[in-house]
Amino acid sequence: MGGRQTRVMTPAMTPEPTDDSPFSYADPGDPLWKRLAIGMVERLSGARHIERLYREKQAEGWRDGEQRSFFHTAISALSLDVQYDADRLVRAPSQGPLVVVANHPFGVLDGIVMCALMERARPDFLVLTNSVLMRAPEMRARMLPVDFAETREAQRINVASRAKALDHLKDGGCVVIFPAGAVSTSPDWLGRQPAIDGAWSPFAARLVLSARAGVLPIYFPGQNSRLFQIASHIHPNLRLGLFFHEVRRRIGAPFPVEIGEAATFDAFAHLDRAVLLTHLRALVYGLAGDAQPRPR
């Protein structure tokens, strides 16, 4: 692709080693049966292998005296070939309120690659993400947790994260959001149709309008396996358990990222929230061009 370059992510500070493991979607607050079910599928589908790769690469960095970020270490451990247009990333606003919006086809890989890119473009970024990932101490400084449990505590966490996101933008910072909240899924029970994001949260548009922020659209081509698509229609626990299977499938693979042109708030000032949300989604999926993901 013309102008596209493969970049190695720039090392950044990382905290001391820890025994805490971010390599599971089983929430300690879930019922025992649910944690066991998710954990069993994860063990069978490669979570331990991925954790071992990460820990080995992390230890290499400490032995060599390198200070790598969690995101850089994860990309290196998985041998991901992250491909993107470096010129477009450089053109992203380096200061001032900026909302980065993206589709969510894979899961944790979307977040890891996105954060690695933002370390280069906007070191002041925060990302709204699944609260389960807060178990990784290396990620906590960047994360604004979103809890999907239907509890008062989850509601409290989500309200606080949204308030922090708005405050950060109003202070001139950058916030990353995957407005679908959940990973893209094929509407077909047999996974024959392309996976696509579900309905986007209006909060993405609210962030832009309330903070008078610019927007940077990013599109991740591709989708998870047909097995994942089928499992998603069978049971949510089976779906959760397969996320690390999907990560393992992509070890050593190209990981293309389509970066759009940033737009200033003036381009959206006249739009109401509903229209803006539709426009934001169109900006992201408009980067797909003719390369639509196909089930594999």
Enumerate the predicted regions with their spans.
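Residue-level "edge-of-site" marker
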Residues: 88, 131, 221
